[in-house]
Amino acid sequence: MKTWPVDLGSKLEVVTPFLGKHRPFVGRCCQRCTPKSWKSFFHKHLTSLGFCNVIKITEENTRYRGWLVRRLSYFLTVCDWQFCNDTPVNMQERIFHSKRVQDIVSQKVSQGKGDAPVASVSVAQWMKDIHRILGQIQSALSPFLLRLCSWALLKLLNQMFLNVILHKGQLEMLHRAVKTADVPVVFLSSHKSELDGLLLPLLLVSQGFSMPRVTWDYKAYTSKHRALLTHLGGVFLPPAVEQVSDSRMGVLSRAVLASYLEELLLSRQRLLIFLEEPFSGVPQLSASGREWLALVFNALQTGNVPDVLIVPMGLSYDVAPGLIRSGRANHTQPRSLWMSLRTICRAACQGLGCIRVDFAQPFSLQEYVANSAFRQSSSGKHLEELLLPEVLGKCPMNLDCEKLEYRSSDSYGAVALNMKQQTLMDNLSLHSLSTAVSCSAIMAVGITSALLLHKHQEGVFLSQLMQDFVWLTEEILLRNYDVGFSGQVRHVVLHTLSLLRRCVSLHRLSLGDVLVAPRRTEAAVTELSRHSAALLPVFIQEAVGACAINALLVELLPYLGSPEQLRDAVFVQEELYNKTASLVQLLPRDIILRQPCQSVYYYCQVAMDKLIQDGLLVAEEVTSDRLACDAAQKNFTKKLLWKATDGFEDSDSDYDEEAGKQCFKLSHLENCTDVFMFLCCLLGPLLKTMRRAVVFLEELECPQPESQYMEKLHQFLLRKANEDCSFDCANKTLAAVSITIYKELGVLRELPGQTGPFLHLSQTFAAKANQEKLEKFIEQFIWQSAC
């Protein structure tokens, strides 16, 4: 690693307190939804709290000693690993005799139009179809390929990364949970790279766990690539599950898939499901992850599997393989085996820093379902009913109502769930994603990228960057997130700059310091944006609250003589909550990580409390001659609409009508403006993309396929980004999120099509005036210096 002999004083050379003296135990399961699991695996009973480097293999990891063993340690270690048993030999017969498949054979399901009569299909033909579908789902494991690829992967990982870190206490917790529960185990992991599906099984096997079956996306890989992955333990959703519900092959594929998963769990094999889309940039549930989790949930609901142990996992890279070029990559084209090998080899030549893998506290799926079903509310409204009146300026939003999840009319799931079960499964997905993200360690590259992108866009001295790095790391640890690094501050920061060498330029100054300037090219801004997105979950509630305050300042600005007077503006607590709730309802729950057991009121309350704890908001007593930002319509907001049910401290019996009139103002401390801007900028890329998507509505002349609309919107965002170098807003994932939000809001309507849904502009937003109102509504939350 290249270093610079710069004398920055002794204060920054010491190991600061957050590096080694305090590391939070992250990833606790929800005490409300799974209280028994929360007690069973409490971390105070764990004895091992250190870390281990999984890819550091020596003769100590083998049963032998000697100079030859030291040279063959990787090979001998892999030979000692115990891989999981293969699926039962009679799997096909057991699936054929399962109730689901027998219902189809005996004509207990409806026939599809144009299909051959079911009675004319022989048993041999049924077995042949089941065999073909099973071949699309999985293949027999190859012990030779498993050991060969594990040995090669260990070699590559040592070339690509400095270390791959696991927490020993989390491993002990997981071993105890698996042994105590004695039920099937399903790992629900975050997803950062295509390497994850090979890396995580290797880590689990190396620590004495059975190798899990890994879920992969069928359409993302070529046939030869899929064949190799299935022999290594990969499983796929057969393509026929997406066919219309009355198609014979679609019905049979769904029945075979559901029966296969039940047999997999009953045979006590592990399953690894990725909850996120790779390279998404924001926490976002993947479609395939939902399907696999729905299958696990359905196996429990039918009673065929008594219980499942859910283990959320967090995965963090300094630099993920393939991340740099993922922005321009065409994800619609299947990846060949050669493309994947080329990506891995390129990463091995570059050096990508470190990896940290964390296991959250396991919990019982049966316990979660029982507790959540008891508390589940049937009331709720769609986003269009909740927020559209406020967007159009007609009346305030009813903040006391829960938002119903949007479901596309063109989608067909792998398993049929009723509305109550679907809601319960969606809540499980959100809970698991939130836990997986919260237990993911924050890497040094993400911290440095966020500082360069959101705070020091014009450049910063290395000494100041180190001070800000220390400050931001302490803030992360105070929010009960862990960091994936340790050591002297100078060494850590210089290491991150070496990994970000394509994104920054360094200039030695005559004063003995170094100027670090982020590049403004598309590749540099895109990479910094993707790295800095790791900090959004840490500060998401404060970011939502800061953007809500920014919206109130925008409303107040026309009534003031100059922007300088905004520092003395006073906000009424009720209006702060209203504006925060508007943004909370607008954004998807998986992005803002609002757990299903948290009401909108509770989420807004925590956001305001955190801003007060950070010192950004201070309480203020308002006199009659002071200007307070209380723009609420009094006939609709005579008292708070929320009923606090998230804790005893928020009991409705303690509600005081005057509490809603408590006032706050922005702090006048020196660094508060910078912190406020930093928090607003974390949500800036998403909000700015949404605003530009509104401007793009003018180009939607007629119904067109959603994929075509997405591509045109992405090209529009790229053109806008070229004008002001805002390439962090030209992300395809953010464009897709914007389209989903506007479909929920009633801006875009869906029409069914043969190749997919068609989008057209709703009648309400065909009017230019309503488009301008929507743009103004989004723009109020955006920090203006980032516009």
Which functions belong to the PLM regions below?
Residues 1-787:
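Membrane-interfacial terminal anchoring regions of lipid-handling membrane enzymes
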